[in-house]
Amino acid sequence: MESCARSASQMSSSSCCRCSSFNQKLKQGGIGGGSLPVSFSCVMIGGGGGRRLIDQERGKVRGRERKIGELMQVRASAQGGLLNLGNLLFNFKGGDPAESTKQQYASTVTLINQLEPQISSLTDSQLTDRTSLLRQRALSGESLDSILPEAFAVVREASKRVLGLRPFDVQLIGGMVLHKGEIAEMRTGEGKTLVAILPAYLNALTGKGVHVVTVNDYLARRDCEWVGQVARFLGLKVGLVQQNMTSEVRRENYLCDITYVTNSELGFDFLRDNLATSVDELVLRGFNFCVIDEVDSILIDEARTPLIISGPAEKPSERYYKAAKIAAAFERDIHYTVDEKQKTVLIMEQGYQDAEEILDVEDLYDPREQWALYILNAIKAKELFLKDVNYIIRGKEILIVDEFTGRVMQGRRWSDGLHQAVEAKEGVPIQNETITLASISYQNFFLQFPKLCGMTGTAATESAEFESIYKLKVTIVPTNKPMIRKDESDVVFRATSGKWRAVVVEISRMHKTGLPVLVGTTSVEQSESLSEQLQQASIPHEVLNAKPENVEREAEIVAQSGRLGAVTIATNMAGRGTDIILGGNAEFMARLKIREMLMPRVVRPGDGGFVSMKKPPPMKTWKVKETLFPCKLSQKNAKLVDEAVQLAVKTWGQRSLSELEAEERLSYSCEKGPAQDEVIAKLRHAFLEVAKEYKTFTDEEKNKVVLAGGLHVIGTERHESRRIDNQLRGRSGRQGDPGSSRFFLSLEDNIFRVFGGDRIQGLMRAFRVEDLPIESKMLTRALDEAQRKVENYFFDIRKQLFEYDEVLNSQRDRVYVERRRALESDNLESLLIEYAELTMDDILEANIGSDAPKENWDLEKLIAKLQQYCYLLNDLTPELLSNNCSTYEDLQDYLRRCGREAYLQKKDMVENQAPGLMKEAERFLILSNIDRLWKEHLQAIKFVQQAVGLRGYAQRDPLIEYKLEGYNLFLEMMAQIRRNVIYSAYQFKPVVVKNQEQQQKGKPDSSNVENKRIGDANLNPVSVTESPSSDSPQNT
């Protein structure tokens, strides 16, 4: 291998020569043959008076590739030696963690395996009956640990009969890790979805319910339909909660033994339950055991964004449009600056002057105008929130795209006027601004579960965070087969243009060899741009991103991503929860074939799924591309499917089912166990025959793909965590299959541009050729350091959010407990008496003071305030109090008694007029005051959190300041709730409402009108005097 040092001018000309050579190869569509990814090997070194390049591109292309191949072999050998040395050192320190886990659970696995012959001999009904026996043992007090071996053996046998899958020993270990309340790290393809049913079944035996949480509706439905079959076969009820379900359906599904649900739906249902105004509106049961699939995605990636339920707040939309026009006219670094790392903008002096002149105001921060917030949000919308990256436009709606999953977050909106600013930028109708009604972070929400566990393919790198925040230990579960995927070195370019050209070359080469290729992009925009380049290169491919037309075909696209020569471009949607089977997924293809023929004939017109509340859904055909199926269905099986569908239509009715009902029945039909229902049995038989026919073709295709080298994964940008990069790589090499991966990077990528610092900037200045691949140890260290910076930065954000939310969490718990007490209690008398006595104490303390001697008591002032709160205390006089009370304690006891008796007197008055009405009024008063004041408290504490940051300049800890001020605000809020509720109760007067029918006839009601129930759902007919916070003085 030859190296040569060149001067700056020589290097420039040489680089240009190399650049043209490289471009020529790009135009040719590939570099050489073979199935392995091309080895880019231009190395940058430093020394002497400048920088030198060691050029390995000498001689003919074939000779260059041979040299590079030798270099890669030497490097692999060196890396293997270092790896072996590392393993020796690691084993010396304590051994392989996966092997340690295997040894820890070996005895229990042996016990389960010993039970297998006995359990296998049972009939289907006998196997189902085992659930009742195990449940009796659990309810009688026997520990779940002692029941575990038999329960796992039962689930294994049921899985074998229903799914045709026998859980491996390592899957049993994964189930035991989950049952223990830990995080199980399992590689992709090791069957995490099937593992979840083991501890879910065991813990469901207690009758307290189990939640299996996934990251999106698609995975929740898929898992419920697939592994849920096992639990249903064993006699358990399995529920599914989806985004567009009604409260009644949600409640029914949450009451099942095992419920599949997304993290956001579960969190929002919790918040909605704590805004309910009647017990009938509650949907959740008590929390017991929770299994989180892709636990790192939910507890780490999404932990930065709290769950928020908002209500409308009136704001003039014209200001958003004006602000958007101003932001569009402003120039960066002249009128404002942008901090992409902190996601903040700052208006400069020139920006202030121009904005104030355009708006004809003296001060942007004038509290009467508050233009500054509108301008800042408009600039954020312009610079930091980009179309087809952070959001997409569907119709006249702005829909947020989740940065971690790549999916549309239906129904979500940015808060604090930001969503309105984006709407103004894009020129779509602006919806009213919102105000927070309830919020909680994922950290504090999931910590409410008495028993929490999770599973993922990548958790070890975040084990410290899991243990420090969630008290969850990470356990590495061994693989069933060795992982043989080849992870190639990163290829780095100076500019993004060179990177994308190289990606196209890589895809072209792989496609020619027959390798299936999965390309991961970080945004909708990137996926669409790459798709256009592949179309120009005449490379057939599929695109999976947040666009609605692609989302609907998600399962279809994933099912064929592992087929020979398939090219799939995907955002992070394909990074998690998707199992790409080499050769194609025969069973899923069979299900799609039956679905294609069944759904149009049984689903009601117009019930084609949830699209938008603002426009009718498009007509849905369920038609699947013919190229998806590996072969044309034989006449025998086509007839079998047609007969089964005809029987289903005849039995269920022509177009009589909702889509959800039809999907559920289809999922039952596509199982493997025996069926009692004639229609389900007929459909199931057709499904199994079609799957069998398809499998002969997919198995043959799988062999070809394996020989070619397996699935090749291409990453186009480093993510904010190595963990997310590994998720993408993990789509390849499942269950011992071959595969490869390579990342193509650019120094202009967001992560390096924003977090790279001076070292990356220096590298960008040193390398001026866009198409020249760069490789060096210094560069690798710089890129790794930038990624570590991002990881540490976002960890600090999550930790800070958790610390601040912990302050609010204790307050939230107290408020929600008080609210639930008012909602569910049949008798609120004791609570109202407590409120009355404490309010008397507050008034007494504010107007007399515990240290004041009797001769200084201002009894007239005290009595005036008391009578403002309660007209029933009009008999109080200074003489009466003076004669009956000699000390402050006597006065306190006397006023408490007066407050208590006044409440009881008021209650009797109302009950005499309308029995049962006082209880409803009390509940209404408590709930409405809690909700209103809690909403105001959330706003106030948000302002405190924003303000305390500045106190760091005064050498004061912002978190401690936040805790102190937050605590004082909370105490005042709780006192205000008590005062408002008891004041309203004292002033409450029922209103006689005549029967509506009699009012129309003009006849009096002959029955006792006052005994009629007044508006259960809404107490609007009841006249409730305003609380002290409005018409009456609230200063006690």
UniProtKB/Swiss-Prot annotation:
GO MF, any single term: ATP binding
Renumbered residue ranges of the record's region Disordered: 995-1036
Subcellular location field: Plastid, Chloroplast stroma; Plastid, Chloroplast thylakoid membrane
EC number: 7.4.2.4
Primary location class: plastid
Source taxon at top rank: Eukaryota
Keywords: ATP-binding, Chloroplast, Membrane, Nucleotide-binding, Plastid, Protein transport, Thylakoid, Transit peptide, Translocase, Translocation, Transport
Keyword Ribosomal protein: no
Binding-site positions, ATP: 186-193
Gene3D superfamilies hit by this protein: Helical scaffold and wing domains of SecA, P-loop containing nucleotide triphosphate hydrolases, SecA, preprotein cross-linking domain
Compositionally biased residues, Polar residues: 1020-1036
Any Gene Ontology biological process: intracellular protein transport
Coiled coil: none
Catalysis: reaction(s): ATP + H2O + chloroplast-proteinSide 1 = ADP + phosphate + chloroplast-proteinSide 2
Pfam families: P-loop_SecA, SecA_DEAD, SecA_PP_bind, SecA_SW
SMART domains from the UniProt entry: SecA_DEAD, SecA_PP_bind
Transit peptide interval: 1-76
Primary enzyme class: translocase
A single Gene Ontology CC term: chloroplast stroma
Basic and acidic residues bias (residue ranges): 1000-1015
Function text: Has a central role in coupling the hydrolysis of ATP to the transfer of proteins across the thylakoid membrane.
Similarity comment text for this entry: Belongs to the SecA family.
NCBIfam families named in the record: secA
Protein name as it appears in the record: Protein translocase subunit SecA, chloroplastic
Annotated organism of origin: Spinacia oleracea (Spinach)
Gene: secA
